[in-house]
């Protein structure tokens, strides 16, 4: 199963450098804290609509593959992050199977828990980079994060109802 927002997320084209944009836009796109928390600060109840979750092979993650270790399988999670039931963000997380050891096994068991609620409670979370992307008037970003030094890639597309616009 797929969703049009995930198709658009995969079509994002990334800037080589951070573009000169309005400071309010950059505040959203370069946020280092949890997007879930930011949405909740808007006075909204945040929920997850699951689109797809499970193991995939390299051929299903061509956009992410150059940014992650080459492995036989990856855990893929595609969701819509909703505020008061309205989709504000499409998210795609790709986790190499080698990352799924120890406490990070919990990444497979998030269910309808927003990823940010898990990631940003970890004292071992670091971020390698944030890249800003755009497609058909919508903004997005991707980040390679690390838990205990182990990588995962998170891509987010801000949907039209998001307060980013």
Swiss-Prot record:
RNA-binding recorded as keyword: no
Binding site for substrate: 35, 77, 115, 156
Any one annotated GO CC term: cytosol
Reactions that this protein is recorded to catalyse: chorismate = 4-hydroxybenzoate + pyruvate
Keyword Lyase: yes
EC number: 4.1.3.40
Pathway assigned to this chain's UniProt record: Cofactor biosynthesis; ubiquinone biosynthesis
Coarse class of the protein's main subcellular location: cytoplasm
Assembly with partners or alone: Monomer.
Task performed by this protein: Removes the pyruvyl group from chorismate, with concomitant aromatization of the ring, to provide 4-hydroxybenzoate (4HB) for the ubiquinone pathway.
The protein, known as: Chorismate pyruvate-lyase
Native source organism of the sequence: Shigella sonnei (strain Ss046)
Species classification: Bacteria, Pseudomonadati, Pseudomonadota, Gammaproteobacteria, Enterobacterales
Gene: ubiC
């Amino acid at each position: 199963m797929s969703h049009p927002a995930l198709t658009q997320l995969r079509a994002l084209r990334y800037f080589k450098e951070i573009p000169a944009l309005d400071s309010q836009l950059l505040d959203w796109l370069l946020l280092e804290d949890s997007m879930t928390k930011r949405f909740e600060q808007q006075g909204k109840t945040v929920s997850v609509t699951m689109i797809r979750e499970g193991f995939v092979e390299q051929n299903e993650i061509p956009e992410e593959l150059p940014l992650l270790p080459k492995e036989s399988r990856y855990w893929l999670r595609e969701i819509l992050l909703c505020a008061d039931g309205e989709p504000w963000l499409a998210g795609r997380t790709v986790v190499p199977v080698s990352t799924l050891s120890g406490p990070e096994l919990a990444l497979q068991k998030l269910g309808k828990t927003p990823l940010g609620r898990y990631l940003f409670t970890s004292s071992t979370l670091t971020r390698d980079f944030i890249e800003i992307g755009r497609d058909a008037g919508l903004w997005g970003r991707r980040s390679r994060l690390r838990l205990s030094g182990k990588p995962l890639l998170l891509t987010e597309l801000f949907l039209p109802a998001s307060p980013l616009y």
